[in-house]
Amino acid sequence: MNCPSCGAPMRLESDAESLTCDYCGSNVFPEKTDDGVRVLGAPTDEMCPKCSMGLVDAAFSGVRILYCTRCRGMLIGMEVFAALVQTLRNGQEGGIAPKAPDRSELDRRLNCPHCHQAMDTHFYAGPGNVILSDCERCSLDWLDHGKLLRIAHAPDALREEAEA
């Protein structure tokens, strides 16, 4: 992306939701998509495991992820996944009862965008009735469109017990 002020190339800040122009010093915070994702860059070398389009650098609630602009899936590092879910859950009252998952998703086979090996597809162990795919070797979780928010907005019996 080029700077809207001077036209020079912009640099993606590490651990930030912005791009910086080294020439004029401008910072650009891209608009959020209707999913709440800030798309920060052009496609990377890593391909979407679902639709084979190049994943882009993006940020969601301050956490850097890779995002597919076609199917809107998210590739999230396991080391930040739980903290991201907690951030999204904080401040929420109650929860939305999740719909039943599509069990046919358990039969799909996705390859990790990083190592290209088969990902493990399974039920998420927390709330939300979500099926996700992960790569233990690369410590990455793949969530289809809407599933992260489904996890965040689902009632959580363990959380409710802790608050009681």
Language model features by range: what are they?
Residues 38-42, 88-103, 151-164:
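Short amphipathic alpha-helical linker/capping segments at the junctions of internal repeats
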Residues 43-57, 62, 102-133:
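Intrinsic, low-complexity N-terminal interaction/targeting segments
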Residues 1-47, 161-164:
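Intrinsic N-terminal pre-sequences and regulatory tails
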Residues 10, 20, 28, 74-76, ...:
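Short, structured motif recognition centered on aromatic/hydrophobic residues
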Residues 3-6, 21-24, 48-51, 68, ...:
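Short cysteine-rich clusters marking metal-coordination/redox-active sites
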Residues 13-16, 31-34, 58-61, 78-80, ...:
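Short Cys/His-rich "knuckle" micro-motifs
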